[in-house]
């Protein structure tokens, strides 16, 4: 096949679309594709060579993507590589406009999508340009200031782009990336997220094994150990998981994951966030940062297989542990994740298996033999996931996920999966009362249909179920239950498509050598006829119940409801599928039945009639000759008979019989055209008779008939969709139909029967047009010219006939011709439309009716608009006709889209992902070929814009601005479609639209004005004329929009118009992307383009450009960049002009200011006139304008920032670093090392003089130096090399002078500050980053020039304790501190002399409204700053934050502010942290709750730096361990005493020292707050330290769920809940268990009780880590069993609950010894009760014997409760044992009763199944127990 292709083409294509080979006109395609490809290569190459990015390059890259859509990758490898390289160069042009970048990127992704086509030898792409692109866009420094506008989609596109280029990065890339990003890995900083994000995206994982040393081996150990040691799910952990999943999947068999597998599964289980235990608090961050299931699934499926089988064991454990969560009665927000896991995992395993066994080998590394999945592996996998999937079938989220999972599992192991589904399906079909069961099981059956019908050696008995299923599904065709009906239709259609319905029962006698199964199938196939007839009867019943008269009044609704139309669709498609698959004999019987039904009664034409007509159409479509013989003569004679009567033709209400026959006729003619030719005379007669009926319904049916006849004759389409090529045959000696059950279509043996219009048919079509269309056109023409006046109804009738004639025959009519519209755009590259051949050779000798209709319709439109503008129906019709004249060639785009979607849905529901290679059923393959034909038919890209189109579009525009809104609306939609089709027509149309908005014109009506605005707004999917991304377009539309505010037809009273302007402004702001002013193409692109122009096969056409042209191209490129600058400046000037017009309404002033703010860019400064305007607007009356101005001025200041010189230094040359590194060895460690100590804050070495300041090497960014040092560190050059500070006014440029003058003006400043200290929205205001940026910019660009003026204001504001003045001064101060980054020492010193008193004052005035603002202020001021530069600030904040002056509240606020500053500094201020801790420790016994909480939070931040990460040095910041020691010492009084700890302190500070115990309790409360806040924040939990506090917490935590407890107890409870969820390392487990063991011996039963709840959560959240440690499991088991015999009843019961939980998640198993242990306990003899004398004291203490007996009973009951949804083999016996204790003393009796009632509750649903597991005797006892009187007692 390939060979022939390459000989015809002249090259061997990379991968073309095979479906093209099956089209009826395939011979013409090779020449066509070669011609187009040559054009693309030639013109794309030239466009780049002539440096014409727009329109040339953009236009021809679009052509290339269309080419790929039509032909696939039909070019040779050499071209492929050149295309990729060229596009890579284009995407990475630094100044390229983002919208173009995206368009190139999408094409590049398509080119790289099939990575098997290009290997690493063929192609290598550098990684750095992509990194720079990503960095420039994602971490843009100017976007937040409004200097860059990026579209929201850009992030996703870049991600996919990098993913596609990743396999081709050079082998040195990994090391380079690590050097680049490793220094960013500082876990306390946002850069950690950045580094991990880049690692996840960029690190290549597909290197061949011999290069692994240069690939993942460089980073795997570091990153996996980091992942293993992080305990609290920071947001970057998700990136690691995705990276590991990809690594595992790309290198199966090359990495030993075994040591990590328990950890991996533990973390996966944790990230499902399942609820465990009774009272659970989830740490919120576990929810937000949970793993993405799609990565988890890839990771798991890559771990399966291999020699150790460990992953499968853990996976089974995982599913065993969570199976019960899938039960339909459970529901919660976690359910979606579980379902996703179920749905994706089988798909992922199937994908892997396909890669191992069926995929054609490619250059990618194959999986080594040792790690391939064996048959046993697959069976184990299916077994482990089967149970949850079967439970999930009936889930609350619907059965779709389960159905998809089953579809994939059935491919792997049909014999394991299908039988249980069948067991659920048969009963569901029998019951009538549970329809949801039926819908669920049927949708699952549809998924496994192919596996079932095909049978195969694994599941040979599969096909036997086919007939029983079909027969039992029939009752589902139920008129009363819509969803049941639809799923039944889908079910029947799916199964019947797979099977030819032929009766082969006689083959049993005539053929020998049939197997047993084949014999059974043959005899069963006798039922098929019965099935088809029954189905037809059911359909008739359905139709009878849904006639219009029965359901609603005739007048209300003529149309079908939405539901009915769905049923109609389901009915007709299922029926036609069944008939297609029938043998001729069965068909004949069905045909007679349908014919009788249709002709013996008369149906109304709206609901029932449509359904019946659909069924009749299905019969004629299947076998046209046989069916037409019955239907056509019948209908024709009936119609002629009735219509012979003259009056009938003029009746308003037609005879029902006539209507019905007409409807039936119009549907049955939808068959192959050649069959209709036999009846041509009758059909013509009927058409002539009925087309001019008076009744509208009548003539519309006649039009439909005409349309269907023409379409059948003129289109190309497949004649049949049967599942076997050549139609369904009877069995013969050599052929047995049952062997074709479930057979996929063979792509190269489809034998599609095409209908291609023959000459006769074409003749007949044109005969009909001459006969019927011509007279109507003449009639309309006369009407227009005023010769003959016709009524409106007649015009409408004529238009209807014209439209239907055109729709039917349009594929034979050539497109409209005309002169191209000149001078829209001048480029040097040709842009021409691609003509795609679609099987029709136009006959130019005939009349071109497309042109004729066009010539008649335009004058008619004119006439209608002038004389009868209210004839809306005719206008609607004309709009439709214009739309079709422009675009229609046989199919509509929206119909094509829905068909494409439904094709994909069906393909998904029936595909075989395991074998791949297009093994779809034949009908689907034919459908796909047909879609390919339609796709070619609809390809309209880049059409030339001709004068005809111009005229029609102008007509549409006229309609879009006409009087009636409905007409406008429809015309606008057609207009938008047209605008998207023709090249550059928008440029032609914009001026015309804008004329309506011209304020000079007085003749524009309000409707026209609105219409024009709507035309500019566009619809949601199409083009928005107001915002085309070109300077020439915006320069016209934006000023025009603003000026339209003065138009006489504009009124702000009309809400609809105001809303339109709002929508326009909103859309422009949403969609605007920065438009480039630089359109240059770099040399590197041109080189590749020249190579492409030299390539051969096919030769590029046209060839390379001459030198002359190249020079011209360069000149144009320069000119274009100049033009862009001028247009930009002109647009800004125009907008400013509009603003200076005094009459402009306020609304439009705001609109203009919005537009102006979009004009800020980072590569061109704003013209100074606009700068002046924005600075003046800072004091505008309107708040909205002031806010825009603040943002804009902040942006302008960024534009004016003079660049500070940076020098690249090797870090090891810095003097401070040299001195600290005596030894030359550079360690790999991160964290606090000798070589980064000089970066840290050290009060003895602070720069306190000019000389120190100059010598000190400041490093501003906090992350440098924590991890490894970068190769090159960028530092600021010394002060003398920086731009001059303190410029005089003369040295400034014009823009700077404007700002300088205003801010030096006392009045301006006073007014400005007054506005800033007003309240905007009461109680909603926050610290504003925009204002901060403004002040930062002022102080950065102008040093301290404005301080003298601002100083009095700041002093005044600080003294005012109201919220707004305080916020205003906070914004100024943070801007000041950050803006002073580069000031000289003397200025900085003066600044702090001013600021320190101000801040002290502010902090003493702090209030509940302002403390957050001050916190933000200080945090913002300290962000990314060297702490040594801010030492004044830190020293001031450290002055006794907790003084008690001003009350507890001020203390808490000061701490908050201080914490904000220190947290930003992370690891660089250990000294300050130590000082703070020392200062706080004595104060931990605070009385006030708010201060305690704040101290807790501060402690979290103090200890944040003490992390336990791999390769990290112990920190020099405070450490938790030492702190815990000191705290425990102070808590002694509490830990030693045995009595209950009560919180009996009244909250008031009494003088004099209280006793130690009270102090200890106060201390404990603060410690609790610290434990709570640190649970979710730090990276690693300090388990050993927390363990020492555990005994104390267990003592306090309350047992009952009671809210009335005091703060201390609830806090303790919360702490325990959070600690128990913590992730444990395997070495910490023994420590925890021994601590728990110790506490379990304590005398307080509260502690013993709480241990159990703690244990439940801890074990579940670390399930696999525990399971991998056998000793730990034994210890837990022993602990629980011991507490089961506790003397306290509550503890015993809790132990039983815990035990049943452990059994349920398979942590422990029910084995013989355990069962025996419980039985022997439960048989403990109780001492006889003595008869007590009356009045004697009842002994209440339970004897030890009773406790043991109860423990045994509890143990048995735990076993029973541990399997709530099924009955394991051991259960009946245990139930019998339990029942023996029903009459024991309390508390035993209660336990037994409760257990039995629970058992009854949980097993009630499926009792029929469960009953099977018991013997008859046991059942008797059980029934007796569950319903016996004692049950009610």
UniProtKB/Swiss-Prot annotation:
<feature type="region of interest" description="Bromodomain-like (BRDL)">
    <location>
        <begin position="1640"/>
        <end position="1728"/>
    </location>
</feature>
<keyword id="KW-0647">Proteasome</keyword>
<feature type="repeat" description="HEAT 2">
    <location>
        <begin position="983"/>
        <end position="1022"/>
    </location>
</feature>
<feature type="repeat" description="HEAT 4">
    <location>
        <begin position="1344"/>
        <end position="1382"/>
    </location>
</feature>
<feature type="repeat" description="HEAT 1">
    <location>
        <begin position="460"/>
        <end position="504"/>
    </location>
</feature>
<feature type="repeat" description="HEAT 5">
    <location>
        <begin position="1626"/>
        <end position="1664"/>
    </location>
</feature>
<dbReference type="GO" id="GO:0016504">
    <property type="term" value="F:peptidase activator activity"/>
</dbReference>
<dbReference type="Pfam" id="PF16507">
    <property type="entry name" value="HEAT_PSME4_mid"/>
</dbReference>
<dbReference type="GO" id="GO:0005634">
    <property type="term" value="C:nucleus"/>
</dbReference>
<comment type="similarity">
    <text>Belongs to the BLM10 family.</text>
</comment>
<keyword id="KW-0227">DNA damage</keyword>
<feature type="region of interest" description="Disordered">
    <location>
        <begin position="1095"/>
        <end position="1122"/>
    </location>
</feature>
<dbReference type="InterPro" id="IPR055455">
    <property type="entry name" value="HEAT_PSME4"/>
</dbReference>
<dbReference type="InterPro" id="IPR021843">
    <property type="entry name" value="PSME4_C"/>
</dbReference>
<dbReference type="GO" id="GO:0010499">
    <property type="term" value="P:proteasomal ubiquitin-independent protein catabolic process"/>
</dbReference>
<dbReference type="InterPro" id="IPR035309">
    <property type="entry name" value="PSME4"/>
</dbReference>
<keyword id="KW-0234">DNA repair</keyword>
<keyword id="KW-0963">Cytoplasm</keyword>
<dbReference type="GO" id="GO:0005829">
    <property type="term" value="C:cytosol"/>
</dbReference>
<protein>
    <recommendedName>
        <fullName>Proteasome activator complex subunit 4A</fullName>
    </recommendedName>
</protein>
<keyword id="KW-0677">Repeat</keyword>
<dbReference type="GO" id="GO:1990111">
    <property type="term" value="C:spermatoproteasome complex"/>
</dbReference>
<feature type="repeat" description="HEAT 3">
    <location>
        <begin position="1164"/>
        <end position="1202"/>
    </location>
</feature>
<feature type="compositionally biased region" description="Basic and acidic residues">
    <location>
        <begin position="1111"/>
        <end position="1122"/>
    </location>
</feature>
<feature type="repeat" description="HEAT 6">
    <location>
        <begin position="1670"/>
        <end position="1708"/>
    </location>
</feature>
<comment type="function">
    <text>Associated component of the proteasome that specifically recognizes acetylated histones and promotes ATP- and ubiquitin-independent degradation of core histones during DNA damage response. Recognizes and binds acetylated histones via its bromodomain-like (BRDL) region and activates the proteasome by opening the gated channel for substrate entry. Binds to the core proteasome via its C-terminus, which occupies the same binding sites as the proteasomal ATPases, opening the closed structure of the proteasome via an active gating mechanism.</text>
</comment>
<dbReference type="Pfam" id="PF11919">
    <property type="entry name" value="PSME4_C"/>
</dbReference>
<dbReference type="InterPro" id="IPR016024">
    <property type="entry name" value="ARM-type_fold"/>
</dbReference>
<dbReference type="GO" id="GO:0006281">
    <property type="term" value="P:DNA repair"/>
</dbReference>
<dbReference type="InterPro" id="IPR032430">
    <property type="entry name" value="Blm10_mid"/>
</dbReference>
<keyword id="KW-0539">Nucleus</keyword>
<dbReference type="GO" id="GO:0006974">
    <property type="term" value="P:DNA damage response"/>
</dbReference>
<dbReference type="Pfam" id="PF23096">
    <property type="entry name" value="HEAT_PSME4"/>
</dbReference>
<dbReference type="GO" id="GO:0035092">
    <property type="term" value="P:sperm DNA condensation"/>
</dbReference>
<dbReference type="GO" id="GO:0070628">
    <property type="term" value="F:proteasome binding"/>
</dbReference>
<dbReference type="GO" id="GO:0016607">
    <property type="term" value="C:nuclear speck"/>
</dbReference>
<dbReference type="GO" id="GO:0070577">
    <property type="term" value="F:lysine-acetylated histone binding"/>
</dbReference>
<dbReference type="InterPro" id="IPR011989">
    <property type="entry name" value="ARM-like"/>
</dbReference>
<comment type="subunit">
    <text>Homodimer. Interacts with the 20S and 26S proteasomes.</text>
</comment>
């Amino acid at each position: 096949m390939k060979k022939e292709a390459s000989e015809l083409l002249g090259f061997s294509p990379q991968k073309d679309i095979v479906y093209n080979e099956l089209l009826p006109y395939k011979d013409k395609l090779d020449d066509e594709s070669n011609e187009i490809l040559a054009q693309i290569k030639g013109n794309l190459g030239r466009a780049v060579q002539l440096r014409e990015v727009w329109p040339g390059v953009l236009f021809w890259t679009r052509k290339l993507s269309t080419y790929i859509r039509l032909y696939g990758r039909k070019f040779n490898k050499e071209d492929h590589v050149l295309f990729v390289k060229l596009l890579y160069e284009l995407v990475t042009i630094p100044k390229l406009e983002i919208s173009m970048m995206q368009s190139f990127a999408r094409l590049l992704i398509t080119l790289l999508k099939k990575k098997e086509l290009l290997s690493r030898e063929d192609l290598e792409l550098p990684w750095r340009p992509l990194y720079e692109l990503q960095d420039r866009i994602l971490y843009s420094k100017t976007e937040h200031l409004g200097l860059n506008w990026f579209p929201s989609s850009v992030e996703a596109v870049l991600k996919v782009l990098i993913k596609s280029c990743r396999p081709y990065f050079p082998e040195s890339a990994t090391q380079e990336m690590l050097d680049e990003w490793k220094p960013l890995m500082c876990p306390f900083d946002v850069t950690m997220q950045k580094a991990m994000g880049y690692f996840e995206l960029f690190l290549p994982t597909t290197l061949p094994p011999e290069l692994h040393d240069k690939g993942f081996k460089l980073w795997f150990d570091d990153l996996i150990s980091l992942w293993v040691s992080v305990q609290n799910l920071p947001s970057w952990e998700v990136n690691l998981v995705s990276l590991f999943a990809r690594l595992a999947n790309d290198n199966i068999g090359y990495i030993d994951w075994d040591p990590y597998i328990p950890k991996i599964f533990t973390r996966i289980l944790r990230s499902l966030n399942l609820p465990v235990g009774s009272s659970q608090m989830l740490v919120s961050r576990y929810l937000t940062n949970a793993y993405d299931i799609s990565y988890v699934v890839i990771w798991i499926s890559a771990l399966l297989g291999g020699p150790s089988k460990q992953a499968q064991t853990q996976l089974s454990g995982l599913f065993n542990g969570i199976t019960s969560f899938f039960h339909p009665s459970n529901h919660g927000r976690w359910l979606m994740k579980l379902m996703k896991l179920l749905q994706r995992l089988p798909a992922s395993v199937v994908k892997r298996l396909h890669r191992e066994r069926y995929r054609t080998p490619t250059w990618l590394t194959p999986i080594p033999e040792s790690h391939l999945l064996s048959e046993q592996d697959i069976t184990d996998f299916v077994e482990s996931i089967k149970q949850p999937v079967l439970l999930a079938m009936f889930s609350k989220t619907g059965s779709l996920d389960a159905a998809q999972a089953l579809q994939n599992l059935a491919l792997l192991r049909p014999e394991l999966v299908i039988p249980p589904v069948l067991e659920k399906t048969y009963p569901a079909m029998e019951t009538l009362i549970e329809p949801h069961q039926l819908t669920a099981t049927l949708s699952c059956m549809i998924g496994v249909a192919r596996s079932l019908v095909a049978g195969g050696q694994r599941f040979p008995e599969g096909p036997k179920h086919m007939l029983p299923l079909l027969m039992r599904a029939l009752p589902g065709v139920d008129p009363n239950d819509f969803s049941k009906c639809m799923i039944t239709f889908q079910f029947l259609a799916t199964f019947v498509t797979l099977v030819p319905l032929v009766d082969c029962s006689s083959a049993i006698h005539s053929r020998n050598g049939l197997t047993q199964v084949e014999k059974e199938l043959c005899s069963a196939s006798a039922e098929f006829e019965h099935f088809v007839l029954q189905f037809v009867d059911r359909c008739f019943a359905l139709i009878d119940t849904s006639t219009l008269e029965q359901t609603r009044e005739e007048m209300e609704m003529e149309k079908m409801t939405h539901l009915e139309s769905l049923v109609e669709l389901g009915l007709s498609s299922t029926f036609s599928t069944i008939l297609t698959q029938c043998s001729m004999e069965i068909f004949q019987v069905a045909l007679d039945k349908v014919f009788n039904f249709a002709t013996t009664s008369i149906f109304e034409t709206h609901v029932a009639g449509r359904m019946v007509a659909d069924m009749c159409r299905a019969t004629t479509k299947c076998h046209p000759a046989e069916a037409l013989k019955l239907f056509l003569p019948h209908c024709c004679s009936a119609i002629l008979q009735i219509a012979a009567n003259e009056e009938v033709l003029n009746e308003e209400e037609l005879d029902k019989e006539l209507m019905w026959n007409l409807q039936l006729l119009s549907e049955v003619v939808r068959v192959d055209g050649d069959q209709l030719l036999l009846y041509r005379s009758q059909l013509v007669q009927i058409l002539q008779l009925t087309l001019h009926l008076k009744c509208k319904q009548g003539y519309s049916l006649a039009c439909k008939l005409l349309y269907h006849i023409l379409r059948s004759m003129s289109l190309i389409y497949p004649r049949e969709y049967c599942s076997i090529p050549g139609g369904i045959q009877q069995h013969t000696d050599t052929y047995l139909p049952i062997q074709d059950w479930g057979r996929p279509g063979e792509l190269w043996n489809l034998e599609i029967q095409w209908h291609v219009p023959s000459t006769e048919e074409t003749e007949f079509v044109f005969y009909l047009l001459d006969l019927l269309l011509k007279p109507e056109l003449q009639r309309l023409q006369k009407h227009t010219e005023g010769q003959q006046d016709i009524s409106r109804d007649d015009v409408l009738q004529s238009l209807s006939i014209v439209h239907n004639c055109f729709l039917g025959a349009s594929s034979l009519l050539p497109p409209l011709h005309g002169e191209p519209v000149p001078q829209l755009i001048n480029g040097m590259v040709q842009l021409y439309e691609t003509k795609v051949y679609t099987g029709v050779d136009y006959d130019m000798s005939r009349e071109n009716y497309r042109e004729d209709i066009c010539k008649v319709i335009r004058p008619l439109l004119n006439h209608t608009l002038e004389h009868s503008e209210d004839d809306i129906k005719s206008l609607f019709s004309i709009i439709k006709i214009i739309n079709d004249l422009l675009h229609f060639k046989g199919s509509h785009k929206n119909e094509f889209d829905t068909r494409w979607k439904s094709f994909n849905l069906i393909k998904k529901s029936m595909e075989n992902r395991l074998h791949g290679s297009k093994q779809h059923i034949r009908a689907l393959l034919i459908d796909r070929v047909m879609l390919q034909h339609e796709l070619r038919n609809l390809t309209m890209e880049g059409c030339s814009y001709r004068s005809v189109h111009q005229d029609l579009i102008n007509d549409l525009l006229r309609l879009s601005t006409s009087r009636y809104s409905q007409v406008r609306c429809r015309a606008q939609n057609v207009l938008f479609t047209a605008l998207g089709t023709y090249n550059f027509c928008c440029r032609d149309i914009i001026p015309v639209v804008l004329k309506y908005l011209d304020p000079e014109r007085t003749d524009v009506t309000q409707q026209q004005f609105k219409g024009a605005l709507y035309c500019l707004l566009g619809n949601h999917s199409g083009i928005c004329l107001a915002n085309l991304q070109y300077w020439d377009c915006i320069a016209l539309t934006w000023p025009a929009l603003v000026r339209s505010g003065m138009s006489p037809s504009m009124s702000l009273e009309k809400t609809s118009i105001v809303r339109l302007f709002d929508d326009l402004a909103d859309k422009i702001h949403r969609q605007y992307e920065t438009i480039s002013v630089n359109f240059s193409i770099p040399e590197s692109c041109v080189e590749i383009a020249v190579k492409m122009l030299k390539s051969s096969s096919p030769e590029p056409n046209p060839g390379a450009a001459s030198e002359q042209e190249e020079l011209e191209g360069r000149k144009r490129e320069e000119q274009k960049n100049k033009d862009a600058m001028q247009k930009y400046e002109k647009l800004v000037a125009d907008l400013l002009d509009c603003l200076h017009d005094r009459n402009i309404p306020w609304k439009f002033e705001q609109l203009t200011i919005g537009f102006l703010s979009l004009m800020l860019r980072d590569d061109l400064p704003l013209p100074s006139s606009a700068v002046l305007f924005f600075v003046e607007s800072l004091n505008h009356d309107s708040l909205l304008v002031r806010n825009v101005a603040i943002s804009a001025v902040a942006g302008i200041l960024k534009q004016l920032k003079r660049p500070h010189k940076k020098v690249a230094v090797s870090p090891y040359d810095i003097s401070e670093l040299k001195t600290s590194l005596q030894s030359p060895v550079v360690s790999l460690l991160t964290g606090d090392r000798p070589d980064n100590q000089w970066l840290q804050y050290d009060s003895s070495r602070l720069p306190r003089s000019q000389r120190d300041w100059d010598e000190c090497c400041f490093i501003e960014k906090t992350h440098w130096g924590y991890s490894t040092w970068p190769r090159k560190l960028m530092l600021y050059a010394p002060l003398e090399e920086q731009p001059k500070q303190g410029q005089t006014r003369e040295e400034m440029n014009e823009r700077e002078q404007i700002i300088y003058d205003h801010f030096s003006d006392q009045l301006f400043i006073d007014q400005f500050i007054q506005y800033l200290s007003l309240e905007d929205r009461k109680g909603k205001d926050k610290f504003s980053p925009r204002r901060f940026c403004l002040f930062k910019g002022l102080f950065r660009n102008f040093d301290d020039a404005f301080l003298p003026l601002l100083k009095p204001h700041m002093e005044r504001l600080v003294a005012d304790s109201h919220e707004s003045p305080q916020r205003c001064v906070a914004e100024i101060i943070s801007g000041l501190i950050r803006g002073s980054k580069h000031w000289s020492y003397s200025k900085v010193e003066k600044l702090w002399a001013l600021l320190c008193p101000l801040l002290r004052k502010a902090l003493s005035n702090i209030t509940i409204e302002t403390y957050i603002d001050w916190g933000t202020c200080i945090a913002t001021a300290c962000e990314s700053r060297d702490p040594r530069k801010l030492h004044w600030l830190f020293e001031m904040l450290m002055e006794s934050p907790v003084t008690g002056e001003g009350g507890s509240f001020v203390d808490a606020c000061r701490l908050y502010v201080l914490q904000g500053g220190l947290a930003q500094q992370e690891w660089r201020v250990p000294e300050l942290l130590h000082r703070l801790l020392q200062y706080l420790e004595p104060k931990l016994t605070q009385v006030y709750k708010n201060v305690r909480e704040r101290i807790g939070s501060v402690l979290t931040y103090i200890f944040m730096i003490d992390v336990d990460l791999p390769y990290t040095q112990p920190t020099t910041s405070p450490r938790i361990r030492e702190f815990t020691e000191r705290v425990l010492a102070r808590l002694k009084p509490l830990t030693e005493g045995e009595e209950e700890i009560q919180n009996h302190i009244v909250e008031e500070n009494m003088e004099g020292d209280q006793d130690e115990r009270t102090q200890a309790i106060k201390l404990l409360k603060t410690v609790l707050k610290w434990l709570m806040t640190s649970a979710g924040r730090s990276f690693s939990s300090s388990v050993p330290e927390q363990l020492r506090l555990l005994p104390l917490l267990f003592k306090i935590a309350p047992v009952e769920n009671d809210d009335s407890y005091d703060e201390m107890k609830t806090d303790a409870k919360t702490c325990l809940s959070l600690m128990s969820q913590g992730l444990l390392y395997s070495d910490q487990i023994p420590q925890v268990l021994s601590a728990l063991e110790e506490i379990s011996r304590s005398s307080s039963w509260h502690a013993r009780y709480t241990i159990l709840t703690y244990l439940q959560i801890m074990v579940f959240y670390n399930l696999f880590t525990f399971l991998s440690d056998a000793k730990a499991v034994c210890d837990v088991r022993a602990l629980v069993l011991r507490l089961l015999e506790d003397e306290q009843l509550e503890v015993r019961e809790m132990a039983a609950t815990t035990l049943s939980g452990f059994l349920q998640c398979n942590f422990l198993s029910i084995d013989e010894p355990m069962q025996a242990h419980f039985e022997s306990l439960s048989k403990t003899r109780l001492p006889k009760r003595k008869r007590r004398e009356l009045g004697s004291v009842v002994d209440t203490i339970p004897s030890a014997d009773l406790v043991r007996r109860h423990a045994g009973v509890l143990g048995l009951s735990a076993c029973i409760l541990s399997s709530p949804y099924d009955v394991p083999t051991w259960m009946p016996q245990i139930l019998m044992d339990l029942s023996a204790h029903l009459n024991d003393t309390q508390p035993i009796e209660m336990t037994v009763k409760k257990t039995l009632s629970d058992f009854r509750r949980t097993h009630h649903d499926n009792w029929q199944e469960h009953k099977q597991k018991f013997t008859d005797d046991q059942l008797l006892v059980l029934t007796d127990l569950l319903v016996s009187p004692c049950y009610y007692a």
